[in-house]
Amino acid sequence: VDLDDLLEKGERFYKLYHDSLNFVTPGNSNVDSIRMMVIVHYTTTWTAYGGGYDDVIGALWVNPATMKPVGQTIAHEFGHSFQYQVYCDDPNKEAGFRQGQSGTSQDGNSFWEMCAQHMAWQNIALFPEWNCDVPIYLANHHRGFMHEWLRYQAFYLMEYWRMKHGEDMLGRVWRESESHEDPITAYKRIAGLSQDQFNAEVWESACHDITWDYPLGGYLRRIVDRQSEADRQTWYTHKT
């Protein structure tokens, strides 16, 4: 394992999520006094989990195969560590979307995954070969937001939020969320939007998807342009 690569990129991920995306509030976070830990398990079993310890501090567990080189996987899982930290830092223990899709803690929550992908995407200059799962997104983008089939791919609406409201908007949605609140309900409340206004934003966001009209859209356009016409047609064909 190239530990220097892990430390260098890990520090960059940390700085982005801490200083720019504002998943924590300096001066009011446990990270002010406690270090997040990265635990490397020397096993051949694929291991890449972001979370934390005892609702106190975020952490990351990985094995060597996930770090050759350090890239999207570590950036994504480190995102989970910061998502975990949101609940740790909330004195009321309400923020951070700890509930699952059904409103309980017994099932998954795709918002965690799509947000971690969005956080990783902000670092794509460090791993430009990542294809962002564009084929899966193009074949399924007609599905609803937070659909389980798009839990790793549907992060472009959050990029629209970043463009419209600023780099820290996603962090605000996490930090200012309320217990068992739906992520979209939280966003509408924080942004002060009615349902009709939110619907208009979804339409505008979809318009950006047509040509990948985002600050990092050049990476996506290159992914599509490298493919054959037949492959592109397959990507754009909805199977259901």
Question: Where does each model-flagged region fall?
Answer:
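Zn2+-dependent metallopeptidase catalytic core
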Residues: 1-57, 61-78, 82-92, 195
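Surface-exposed intrinsically disordered loops and tails
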Residues: 90-104, 140-143, 208, 229-237
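Surface-exposed patches in mature extracellular/periplasmic domains of secreted proteins
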Residues: 18-36, 90-97, 104-109, 128-135, ...
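Long, well-structured alpha-helical subdomains associated
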Residues: 125-176
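Sec/Tat-exported extracytoplasmic proteins
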Residues: 13-24, 77-78, 82-86, 119-127, ...
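Stable alpha-helical elements in mature extracytoplasmic
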Residues: 2, 6-13, 70-78, 111-115, ...
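Zinc-dependent metallopeptidase catalytic helix centered on the HExxH motif
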Residues: 55-138, 153
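Beta/coil-rich, acidic/histidine-enriched accessory regions frequently appended to metallopeptidases
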Residues: 180-240
